[in-house]
Regions:
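Conserved phosphate-binding/catalytic loop of the ribokinase/pfkB sugar-kinase fold
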Residues: 102-106, 118-163
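A short, aliphatic-rich alpha-helical micro-motif
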Residues: 145-149, 205-206, 236
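Conserved phosphate-binding/catalytic region of the ribokinase-like
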Residues: 1-7, 12, 26-32, 37, ...
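Conserved beta-alpha-beta core of the PfkB/ribokinase-like small-molecule kinase fold
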Residues: 153-233, 249-251
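A glycine-rich helix N-cap at a beta->alpha junction
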Residues: 93-110
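Alpha-helix C-terminal capping segments
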Residues: 65-74, 118-121, 286-289
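Hydrophobic beta-strand scaffold residues
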Residues: 75, 101, 184-185, 242
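Glycine-rich phosphate/adenosyl-contacting loop at the front of the ribokinase-like
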Residues: 1-78, 88-89
Length: 329
């Protein structure tokens, strides 16, 4: 069985992206700048209202895995898609990106492939309206222990915490990975996701994970505080590696007694979709290569900077060349 440097488990979502202005968001009743879960009917209304749609395989951790695969890691993604047009598109697109899509599209059943309508406003802010469909039904049976148990690194998506079988799949996969000598971590995904499942998040982080990646709001939400320093200290007390992205203020990484802060160059994003996902791709690439945490953060920042320079959540440049130019490879 193949050994992977990086395996991700998350929602397999087709992103449908369109540009708009704030008046459109207000007219359609879309809350700016956050991810909202919607029902199937609402999804059809929003899809019909989109202008000049761009369709791409998405899902937070899937984007990360694709980015890391593009950098040259042996990578695999575990997620559920239906055997419909969008599901077949998704599976093929992941394969085309150099990522092994472990589970074939699922035939039968009523739930279609998940999709997220993403509206990008003039300031680059993304407003996501996601119909989860079949992807949220992921369970332990979708996670082969032959894949999880042979992963060097495993990365889990917090959004899958919304169903008990997703939580169970995570715990089992994390334990398989660690028993096989790998390291397992999580993308916190969203402060609201933490609010819904705080106790389970903290238990998983403390007992089953080796690293956590989240933005400032997500890290704060773990311990219900507005004080980032307090949140970082408390998270670091239960997890050996904590990575906190702070948008234009850079990245803070805490590993045991070591702490580094890596600045970023402030730019106006064309599209902020995927910035955190591609940061994680770069950081995990560095981890897989055994690089220091500061270099990992710099690689992550470079990957994030590239993806916010264009529409879409995955890199368009050959990132290995970009990293070489910047002296990071």
């Amino acid at each position: 069985m193949k050994t992977y440097q990086l395996v991700g488990i998350g929602n397999a979502v087709v992103d449908v992206i369109s540009q708009c202005d704030d008046s459109f968001l207000e007219h359609m009743g879309i809350e700016k700048g956050i991810m909202q879960l919607i029902e199937r009917d609402r999804g059809e209304v929003l899809y019909a209202a989109m202008q000049e749609r761009v369709q791409t395989p998405g899902g937070s951790v899937a984007n990360t895995i694709a980015g890391a695969g593009a950098l040259g890691l042996e990578a695999a993604f575990i997620g559920r898609v239906h055997d419909d047009a969008l599901g077949r598109f998704y599976a093929q697109a992941m394969t085309d990106d150099g990522v092994d899509f472990v589970n074939p599209p699922v035939a039968g059943g009523e739930l279609p492939t998940s999709r997220s309508m993403i509206f990008v406003s003039g300031d680059g802010e993304r407003s996501m309206n996601t119909y989860l469909g079949i992807s949220s039904e992921l369970s332990s049976s979708d996670v082969p222990d032959t894949v999880a148990g042979k992963a060097q690194l495993m990365f889990l998506e917090g959004y899958l915490f919304d169903k008990d079988k997703g939580k169970t799949a995570f715990m089992e996969a994390a334990r398989d990975c660690r028993e096989g000598g790998g390291k397992c971590g999580i993308a916190i995904s969203d402060p609201f996701c933490v609010e819904r499942h705080r106790a389970d998040f903290l238990s998983l982080i403390e007992n089953d994970l080796d690293f956590v990646i989240g933005n400032e709001a997500e890290i704060k939400s773990l311990f219900e505080t507005d004080d980032l320093e307090e949140a970082l200290a408390k998270t670091a007390a239960i997890c050996s590696l904590v990575v906190c992205t702070r948008s234009g203020d850079g990245v803070t990484v805490v590993q045991g007694d070591s702490r580094v802060s890596v600045p970023v160059e402030r730019v106006v994003p064309v599209d902020a979709t995927g910035a955190g996902d591609q940061f994680a791709a770069g950081f995990l690439f560095g981890m897989a290569k055994g690089l220091g945490i500061e270099t990992c953060a710099k690689i992550g920042n470079a990957c994030a900077a590239e993806v916010i320079s264009h529409i879409g959540p995955r890199p368009k440049a050959v990132m290995s060349q970009v990293l070489r130019r910047e002296g990071l490879l």
